[in-house]
Amino acid sequence: MANIKSQIKRNRTNKKAQERNKAVKSELKTAIRATREAVATGDKEKASSALRLASKKLDKAASKGVIHKNQAANRKSAIAKQVAAL
């Protein structure tokens, strides 16, 4: 346990950020999974709308600093490639 006042506050803010980042990453995984499932079923309409949502969430996570912008770009291109193959 930290004794310094500033470190106690940092621990508190780090915990909040960790919970927020965990929630965002969970949403990302769900959105990407939904896109991949739509691709697996062969539903082009559903896949393209899921891709749009996943891309939006990836961009938002990258802008907030939850994931790196290059990682967001790589994930977007990977799922876009799968949707385009339909």
Swiss-Prot record:
<dbReference type="InterPro" id="IPR036510">
    <property type="entry name" value="Ribosomal_bS20_sf"/>
</dbReference>
<dbReference type="GO" id="GO:0003735">
    <property type="term" value="F:structural constituent of ribosome"/>
</dbReference>
<dbReference type="InterPro" id="IPR002583">
    <property type="entry name" value="Ribosomal_bS20"/>
</dbReference>
<dbReference type="Pfam" id="PF01649">
    <property type="entry name" value="Ribosomal_S20p"/>
</dbReference>
<feature type="region of interest" description="Disordered">
    <location>
        <begin position="1"/>
        <end position="27"/>
    </location>
</feature>
<protein>
    <recommendedName>
        <fullName>Small ribosomal subunit protein bS20</fullName>
    </recommendedName>
</protein>
<keyword id="KW-0699">rRNA-binding</keyword>
<comment type="similarity">
    <text>Belongs to the bacterial ribosomal protein bS20 family.</text>
</comment>
<keyword id="KW-0687">Ribonucleoprotein</keyword>
<dbReference type="GO" id="GO:0005829">
    <property type="term" value="C:cytosol"/>
</dbReference>
<feature type="compositionally biased region" description="Basic and acidic residues">
    <location>
        <begin position="16"/>
        <end position="27"/>
    </location>
</feature>
<dbReference type="GO" id="GO:0015935">
    <property type="term" value="C:small ribosomal subunit"/>
</dbReference>
<comment type="function">
    <text>Binds directly to 16S ribosomal RNA.</text>
</comment>
<keyword id="KW-0694">RNA-binding</keyword>
<dbReference type="GO" id="GO:0006412">
    <property type="term" value="P:translation"/>
</dbReference>
<keyword id="KW-0689">Ribosomal protein</keyword>
<dbReference type="GO" id="GO:0070181">
    <property type="term" value="F:small ribosomal subunit rRNA binding"/>
</dbReference>
